[in-house]
């Protein structure tokens, strides 16, 4: 059973910020940046999000799953065998999602 998040949009934005920091980092190999940036979204609560944001999250998760579906990774090491192009596509999706859910300044 998962915990209910009081402010799901705030939580999502926090997770997205963390995911982008990981995605943009250069200390880890690309496959590990993908793995850890996706893990930042683990447990994300969609219930309670504004409908537009909810649709954006679902659309981006579908895009990630489409790429992952080529490989069907079961363990962390499986990400290492993914092509650099596919890994970069996932990182781009993560960053695009963060852009979509972050309020304009």
List each language-model region with its residue ranges.
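Serine/threonine-rich low-complexity intrinsically disordered regions
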Residues: 3, 8, 29, 42-45, ...
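Low-complexity, intrinsically disordered short peptide segments enriched in small/polar/basic residues
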Residues: 1-2, 19, 61-64, 87
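Leucine-/aliphatic-rich long alpha-helical segments
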Residues: 19, 41, 78-79
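Short terminal alpha-helical segments
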Residues: 2-38, 91-98
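Amphipathic alpha-helical binding modules
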Residues: 72-105
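A structural signal for alpha-helical segments
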Residues: 4-7, 11, 52, 78, ...
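Amphipathic alpha-helical interaction modules
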Residues: 22-70
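Short, leucine/isoleucine-rich alpha-helical interaction segments at C-terminal helix-coil junctions
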Residues: 19, 64-67, 97-104
